[in-house]
């Protein structure tokens, strides 16, 4: 078992909310509120409403689904629904230095378990900021496969760590929950996004589900191999996982303060082009019928998001031509 994973788990177990610097506490609250707003907005998407209605037939209790009417569900299902809703409109925040939307992967499980277990607001915030820390550090060492989307991969393990923290597990218990969660990792593809396949959003919701399930597996006595995380991230869902920098600045550098917030409801590689377009429109004030074409120079990842006629709402979030046209015609690229 890697020493770094064990020490990271011990940090999650031992760190209190009061140990988190005040500026980091403030930023954590901002990220929580931003993410909660995105979940509420996404809860109104038709497929999310339909899933919520279907799962209500076997509804449990103990955790709130953040949607109109505030329905309740068991914590695993509530976390799944809230995480799926939060992914549905492509407005969630993310890690600035590596790929991943840490808050939306971690917070749904934290909210569901925190409510179900009767934890205080401070305990919920602590689990959230610590889960975010684990997410950023695991993602920083993880090399995903070329087509992989990071929903339900390294960040799912961080959600499990946050859930285990809320259950009161010690460092070894949190490590076990994370290693058990390695068998729950998913293989979503970026091609889902450009094709408009909303299956991708379920992968986001499954991280919340894992946050509630993995600690229960650990408490039930399930065991995991010692190198489960290294093997899963380095050989199965990914092509490499470097642990040498996993603990750098731990407790001094808080990754949640290095996030980004989305101002446009589309995939973040599109955002720089929209920033430039917004400045041009503000300076020139053209009418839409005065614009014959828009030429964009961008980097490779954004350049593949080029379908001018996306097949549905979700695919439009991954179309640079659609986002640019929406900004010209509507004045913004919101959801």
List the model feature ranges, each with a label.
Residues 1-260, 300:
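N-terminal core-entry segment
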Residues 99-102, 152, 266, 313, ...:
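Aromatic-acidic/polar surface patches that form glycan- and anion
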Residues 263:
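Acyl-CoA/ACP chain-elongation machinery
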Residues 267-335:
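Intrinsically disordered, low-complexity Ser/Thr/Pro/Gly-rich interaction regions
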């Amino acid at each position: 078992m890697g020493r770094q994973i064990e020490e990271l788990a011990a940090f999650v177990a031992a760190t209190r909310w009061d140990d988190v610097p005040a500026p980091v506490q403030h930023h954590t609250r901002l990220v929580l509120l931003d993410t909660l707003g995105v979940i509420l907005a996404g809860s109104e998407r038709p497929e999310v409403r339909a899933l919520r209605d279907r799962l209500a037939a076997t509804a449990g209790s103990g955790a709130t689904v953040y949607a109109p009417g505030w329905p309740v569900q068991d914590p695993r299902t509530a976390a799944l629904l809230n995480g799926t809703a939060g992914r549905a409109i492509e407005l969630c925040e993310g890690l600035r230095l590596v790929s991943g939307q840490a808050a939306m992967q971690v917070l749904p499980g934290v909210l569901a378990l925190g409510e179900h277990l009767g934890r205080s607001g401070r305990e919920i915030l602590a689990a959230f900021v610590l889960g975010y820390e684990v997410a950023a550090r695991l993602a920083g060492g993880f090399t995903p496969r070329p087509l992989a989307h990071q929903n339900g991969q390294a960040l799912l393990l961080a959600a499990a760590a946050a859930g285990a923290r809320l259950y009161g597990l010690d460092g070894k218990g949190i490590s076990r929950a994370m290693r058990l969660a390695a068998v729950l990792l998913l293989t979503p593809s970026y091609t889902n996004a450009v094709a408009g396949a909303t299956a991708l959003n379920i992968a986001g919701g499954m991280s919340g589900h894992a946050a509630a399930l993995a600690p229960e597996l650990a408490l039930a006595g399930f065991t995991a191999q010692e190198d489960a995380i290294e093997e899963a991230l380095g050989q199965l869902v990914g092509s490499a996982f470097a642990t040498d920098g996993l603990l750098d600045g731990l407790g001094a550098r808080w990754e949640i303060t290095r996030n980004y917030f989305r101002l446009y409801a589309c995939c973040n590689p599109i955002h720089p082009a929209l920033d430039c377009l917004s400045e041009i429109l503000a300076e020139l004030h053209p009418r839409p019928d005065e614009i014959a074409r828009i030429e964009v120079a961008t980097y490779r990842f954004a350049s593949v998001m080029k379908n001018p006629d996306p097949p549905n709402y979700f695919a439009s979030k991954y179309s640079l031509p659609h986002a640019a046209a929406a900004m010209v015609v509507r004045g913004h690229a919101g959801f």
